[in-house]
Amino acid sequence: IIKDPLIPGGGDFATDDTLNGLYAVKITSTTADYIPDETISQTVAGGTALGQVVSWTRDVPGTVPTPSTPGSGVLKYIQSPQVHQNNGVVRAFESSAANAITGDQSNVPGTVHHDYANGTLLLGCTFNSGLASPELQNNSGDLIYIENRRLITRAPDQIEDIKLVIEF
């Protein structure tokens, strides 16, 4: 939980109940799925934009893109100055149909849907020319609660018993 985050480009506090802290790209003409945690790249003016995939959500759930039937979706990612530098600069991804965004593990090239309607809200992101920025300013606010739980592996047929004792 973050207390008093700022909105980008100003000193005003964010007042919405929920905010998206990820960058996103509306992708079209992809022939496979991007893999979470893989590095993505795009050739941009001055170098290469780099990022790390957080999630890939297909526009049509249940369909798998192939070379014969390309798909589309929303690619959410982060950019960290420690990891995603190119010649000492963290470069932004561009709204260009000419330069594909490619995953380093999946080898998936995807085209930015650069004419995606401006101001369109999809999956919690507001897109402009196929790109969406975070709704809060990076490194703003106070982190007041974090919880990291370890993964618990469960069998599909496992039954959990929960007991609650209330005394007066």
Predicted segments — roles?
Residues I1-F168:
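Interface-prone segments of viral and bacterial extracellular assemblies
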